[in-house]
Amino acid sequence: MKKEEYWDIYDENKELTGRTMKRNDWNMRPGDYHLTVLGVIRHTNGRYLITKRVMTKSWAPGSWEVSGGGVMAGETSRAAVLREVREETGLDVSDFAGGYLFSYRRDNPEEKDNYFVDIYRFTGDFSESDLHLQEAETDGWKLASVDEIRALAAEGMFLHYDSIRDAFEE
């Protein structure tokens, strides 16, 4: 049986409140937030690793994205992005160049889902044999140029682009 996962609850200033919530419980009070991370992985050849969501996902099946997910209770943002990238792609980016870039905040009071997103970018050398996709999450990958990512975003097929576009700029 899988252990239940919990997220820390933050206030509007991104300070821990000392409270937690069940992962994906979507019943947050106004002014409560959880923390998520996205890891933009740049190959030394200048292209970006993007993955395609499985068609069985309830939200945005078949869309392209960068690795990411929720920060577990007691976990740091950096530890979470390293974990998510490893779980979803098999890559250990802990020794890659780069790190934290910026954060943004989303307020969704109708859905009772308010959150912060910490954006990281890591640059390193890796080969196809280093990639081991998480089958329940991803249905393919590619190394894409910024122009290819922009084109996918223009088609509505690349998630979060408007919020993270600065992570693809040098």
Predicted regions span which residues?
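The catalytic Nudix box helix
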Residues: 49-50, 66-99
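Nudix hydrolase/Nudix homology domain
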Residues: 61-62, 73, 100-104, 112-170
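Short, solvent-exposed loop/turn elements at beta->coil junctions and helix N-caps
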Residues: 23-27, 102-108
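A glycine-rich, hydrophobic loop/mini-helix early in the fold
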Residues: 36-68
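Short loop segments at secondary-structure junctions
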Residues: 13, 43-46, 54, 123-128, ...
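Acidic, metal-coordinating catalytic segment for phosphate/diphosphate chemistry
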Residues: 2-38, 44
